[in-house]
Swiss-Prot record:
UniProt keyword terms in alphabetical order: Repressor, Ribonucleoprotein, Ribosomal protein, RNA-binding, rRNA-binding, Translation regulation, tRNA-binding
GO annotation (BP), single: regulation of translation
GO MF term list: rRNA binding; structural constituent of ribosome; tRNA binding
Function (record text): Binds directly to 23S rRNA. The L1 stalk is quite mobile in the ribosome, and is involved in E site tRNA release.
HAMAP family: Ribosomal_uL1_B (MF_01318_B)
Similarity field: Belongs to the universal ribosomal protein uL1 family.
Protein name per Swiss-Prot or TrEMBL: Large ribosomal subunit protein uL1
GO annotations of cellular component type: large ribosomal subunit
PANTHER family listed in its UniProt record: 54S RIBOSOMAL PROTEIN L1, MITOCHONDRIAL (PTHR36427), LARGE RIBOSOMAL SUBUNIT PROTEIN UL1M (PTHR36427:SF3)
Keyword Lipoprotein appears in the UniProt entry: no
Domain of life: Bacteria
Length: 231
C-alpha cells in the first residue's frame, strides 16, 4: 500500500469515520480534506439495496446537474444530413459518420461522450469492443441514442452525468469540484440522490439507500446520513 503523505493524514484527523454527517457538513469536510495541488473532483458513492444480477433491478440513467460538474465535456455526434447540421449548431465538438468510425477504430479517442442518432447505431455498434470497455457506447437509457441531438448536446454541455449500478450494487457519480460553493455541491448531491430514489426498482426489498459517502479525487471518504432521504 502506498504511503500516505502528511497532509493526507492531517486531513483524515478532521473526519470521524464512524459518524454519518449531514450533507453540507460532509461536503465541507471533503473540501477541507482536499490536499492535492489541482482542483479535485467531488464524487458521491451510493451503496444500494439491489441485486444487480437480476434484470429488474438494473439501475442506469442520466441526469443534468443544476450546477454542472466543472468539467467541459467533448461531445462526438454520429449523425447525417440535417441532424448533423443540428448537432454542429448545438455546439458538438465533433460530428461525423463513417469517417469518425474509422478514426476510432484506429485509436482516436479525443472526446468524452458519444451521441448517435438511431439510424447510425448499426455502424456505431461495430465499435462495441472498443467503446464498451471505456463506457463510451451510446445508450437510449442515458439519452445518447436519440434523434433529439440538439437537446442531447445541450444537456451534456450543461452538466449531464450518467449513473449505473455496478456488480456490487454501488453507484459512483461526480458532483462537481472542490472549488464549488458547498451549497452548489449540496444541490448537485441532492439531485443525484433524488434521482436514484425515484429510480428504485419495484422488486428491490429492504433498505434501498444502504450507505452514502462523498470524497474528493485524492481525499478520504466522508459518510453522509441517509435519514433525510427516502429509503
Amino acid at each position: 500500500m502506498a504511503k500516505r503523505g502528511k497532509k493526507y493524514l492531517e486531513a483524515v484527523k478532521l473526519i470521524d469515520r464512524d459518524q454519518a454527517y449531514q450533507v453540507e457538513e460532509a461536503l465541507e469536510l471533503v473540501k477541507k480534506a482536499s490536499v492535492a495541488k489541482f482542483d479535485e473532483t467531488v464524487e458521491v458513492a451510493v451503496r444500494l439495496g439491489v441485486d444487480p444480477k437480476k434484470a429488474d433491478q438494473q439501475i442506469r440513467g442520466a441526469v443534468v446537474l443544476p450546477n454542472g460538474t466543472g468539467k467541459t465535456q467533448r461531445v462526438l455526434v454520429f449523425a447525417k444530413g440535417e441532424k448533423a447540421k443540428e448537432a454542429e449548431a448545438a455546439g458538438a465538438d465533433y460530428v461525423g459518420d463513417e469517417d469518425c468510425i474509422n478514426k476510432i477504430s484506429q485509436g482516436w479517442f479525443d472526446f468524452d461522450v458519444i451521441v448517435a442518432t438511431p439510424d447510425m447505431m448499426a455502424q456505431v455498434g461495430k465499435l462495441g469492443r472498443v467503446l464498451g470497455p471505456k463506457g463510451l457506447m451510446p445508450n437510449p437509457k442515458t439519452g445518447t441514442v436519440t434523434f433529439e441531438v440538439e437537446k442531447a448536446v445541450n444537456d451534456i454541455k450543461a452538466g449531464k452525468v450518467e449513473y449505473r449500478v455496478d456488480k456490487a450494487g454501488n453507484i459512483h457519480v461526480p458532483i462537481g469540484k472542490v472549488s464549488f460553493d458547498t451549497a452548489k455541491l449540496a444541490e448537485n448531491f441532492e439531485t443525484i440522490i433524488d434521482t436514484l430514489v425515484k429510480a428504485k426498482p419495484a422488486a428491490a426489498k429492504g433498505t434501498y439507500l444502504k450507505n452514502i459517502a462523498v470524497s474528493s479525487t485524492m481525499g478520504p471518504g466522508v459518510k453522509v446520513s441517509t435519514a433525510s432521504f427516502g429509503k
